[in-house]
Amino acid sequence: MVSAAAGWAAPAFAVAAVVIWVVLCSELLRRRRRGAGSGKGDAAAAARLPPGSFGWPVVGETLEFVSCAYSPRPEAFVDKRRKLHGSAVFRSHLFGSATVVTADAEVSRFVLQSDARAFVPWYPRSLTELMGKSSILLINGALQRRVHGLVGAFFKSSHLKSQLTADMRRRLSPALSSFPDSSLLHVQHLAKSVVFEILVRGLIGLEAGEEMQQLKQQFQEFIVGLMSLPIKLPGTRLYRSLQAKKKMARLIQRIIREKRARRAAASPPRDAIDVLIGDGSDELTDELISDNMIDLMIPAEDSVPVLITLAVKFLSECPLALHQLEEENIQLKRRKTDMGETLQWTDYMSLSFTQHVITETLRLGNIIGGIMRKAVRDVEVKGHLIPKGWCVFVYFRSVHLDDTLYDEPYKFNPWRWKEKDMSNGSFTPFGGGQRLCPGLDLARLEASIFLHHLVTSFRWVAEEDHIVNFPTVRLKRGMPIRVTAKEDDD
């Protein structure tokens, strides 16, 4: 395990070091001086800064952060400084900005709940280039609230959940039945294939076929550029990703124009485009809608399939939890079969232990390790000053693995959620506040449906696989399991 991790981290770290040095040198010096100058000459303000260090000249502490991020324990960067400074809130210098890092649940909650009068989103330049200025991840104020509210309400609607449930069942049943006994099923690959097509249908109304396959290929070309070198010259990774986005945008904007041309308001809306064009606001342009449809496809390629895959991995390593989840799902299937009824989305979400498994997977897996915000004014919280222009890194992972908040935090223990309070800010896998992930209910539903069909269809033996944590969480081999079909009376 150690040698495999080292084999992955060494070349990746070398590349990261070169990239950071080449791209950030001049900008880092400028920002560093600006950040370090905050509160200059003001001893009282300086005293209120969190403890910490800006690290090395030019690169700050970025190289050590990246090195830890590629390791099996990314939180080591934060844990080391918590012990050194005696505080879960400390200052650092990461990716070109003076940064306050918080692994304190109360401070993290404060930042997440704050609006654009205190903090605005901050992302790497390559990501902002690809997302576009009208992305829900980047816009602020009333427009952000409107788009988030419209999309969030649609994602919570019974209509979409019913459609998604039927689509998942229709795609999963033949997909799983195609695996003969003793064959190898790669959970991550299957989950991506199923979830992407279903979510795209819910977003833009596109059905399976040639255009769906082209969109999938272009999206895969697009997504690999999100954490790339921010250079747009022909042939570079970012350039190729931008070209892929243009092709996707042309397809989506054609769909938008067709919908606008024939539109009498669909009731209920069939997809997210229907919802946004039905609002009637001049601010919701075709470009804004297409940008956000592409952004909302990211969970289908990344976070939801990884949630499913990690759940299978953790269950495979915890036979007692797997057995209880199997029993719960088999009982539901038998009960609905005896009643002559098809499972509805409410049935899947009623499976309490399955929901505990998903919650624990989100806590332990930390698919989203944290988020960054930038202070637009001086902000003070719990006696710590966050100067205007500084970034704040809200590190979910350290909070989720804090042994003062969770007993045996590195142990997969779904039973802890029978009594655990999730309202105190110590559990934030989907972010929070006005930027809370609008698709959190759909992510849980998709994972519940996938797990139900998997555990009621197969027994399996998992092959060894390892979690890669950076730049995104994934399983190195795609989580291969060797499956055996269950008999109907099992």
UniProtKB/Swiss-Prot annotation:
GO terms for molecular function: heme binding; iron ion binding; oxidoreductase activity, acting on paired donors, with incorporation or reduction of molecular oxygen, NAD(P)H as one donor, and incorporation of one atom of oxygen. Keywords: Brassinosteroid biosynthesis, Heme, Iron, Lipid biosynthesis, Lipid metabolism, Membrane, Metal-binding, Monooxygenase, Oxidoreductase, Steroid biosynthesis, Transmembrane, Transmembrane helix. It is a single-pass membrane protein. Disruption phenotype: Plants show abnormalities in growth: inhibition of second internode elongation, shortened leaf sheaths, erect leaves, and deficiency in skotomorphogenesis. Treatment with exogenous brassinolide (BL) rescues the abnormal phenotype. Induction: Down-regulated by brassinolide (BL) in ebisu dwarf (d2) mutant. It is found in: Membrane. Pfam families: p450 (PF00067). Pathway: Plant hormone biosynthesis; brassinosteroid biosynthesis. Catalyzes the C6-oxidation step in brassinosteroids biosynthesis. May convert 6-deoxoteasterone (6-deoxoTE) to 3-dehydro-6-deoxoteasterone (6-deoxo3DT, 6-deoxo3DHT), and teasterone (TE) to 3-dehydroteasterone (3DT, 3-DHT). Involved in the elongation of leaf sheaths and stems. Belongs to the cytochrome P450 family. This is Cytochrome P450 90D2.
